[in-house]
Structures are given as C-alpha cells and as structure tokens.
Design a protein with these regions (language model features):
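C-terminal helical subdomain
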Residues: 42, 64-100
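Alpha-helical segment proximal to the catalytic Tyr-Lys
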Residues: 31-35
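Residue(s) in the substrate-gating loop at a strand-loop-helix junction
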Residues: 2
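Active-site helix of classical SDR
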Residues: 18
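Rossmann-like NAD(H)/NADP(H) cofactor-binding core
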Residues: 36-41
Length: 124
C-alpha cells in the first residue's frame, strides 16, 4: 500500500481513496488476527522505481509522487519485509520514515496540507 494511503493526493482521488481503504482493512485485520497468532503487516512505501512509476512521470497529477528525493528501488521494499516485517511483525512499516511522517501530518492537518500542496505543485 503506497504512501497515498496515509494522506490524500490531489489529482489521484480514486487511487488515494482505494489505498486508504486497503490500509484501513489491513490494519484492522492485523489487530483482529493477532489474537489467533496471525500477523499482518502493512507496508507503505513511497514511490518505487517500477514500469508503473515510469508511466506516471509526465502526468501533472502525479507531481507529488515525484516530490521526494528519489524513488525507492524494489530491493529496499524487499529488505523491509525480510528484515523487519517477518522478524518483528509490526502492524505497519513506512518507507522512508521521514516522508511517512510528513504524510501522516498532512492527513492530521488537511487544510494546512492542502495549502502547502497547492503551492508546491504550482511552482514548477
């Protein structure tokens, strides 16, 4: 589930909404299944360098997707699963942590975030 599950992404309403739903379902499943010894970890990576990401690079509505320092590589997500999710079984892993924190803050303060996003997206 990408970082779009943590904060609304202007221009990608349906995509963002579907990711919010998957994250919510996964977190609840993890909570409910824990009593049965079943772990569910939701992995929320930032943009990952894949062919799907390449298709978005020229689309204006995807500007926030490319606002980070760099796209993650697939191996970074794999490492998070192998080194953290399978060993520690947290409910959620966010990659990278700093962008995840920013996304969560944007979700907590949507009016402020909307103003900031509007400014940063329009300043190309």
């Amino acid at each position: 589930v990408p970082l779009a599950a943590l904060a609304p992404v202007p221009g990608l309403a349906l995509y963002s909404a579907s990711k919010f739903a998957v994250r919510g379902y996964s977190l609840v499943a993890g909570m409910e299944l824990a009593e049965h010894g079943i772990a569910v970890t939701t992995i929320c990576p930032d943009a990952v360098q894949t062919p799907m990401l390449d298709q978005q690079k020229d689309k204006e509505q995807a500007a926030l997707t490319f606002s980070g320092a760099r796209a993650l590589i697939v191996q970074e997500v794999v490492d998070a699963i192998l080194d953290n999710a399978l060993k520690n079984k947290p409910l959620e892993i966010i990659l990278p942590t700093m962008r995840g924190g920013i996304a969560k803050a944007a979700n907590a303060f949507p009016t402020i975030a909307a103003r900031q996003v509007g400014c940063s997206v329009n300043k190309k």
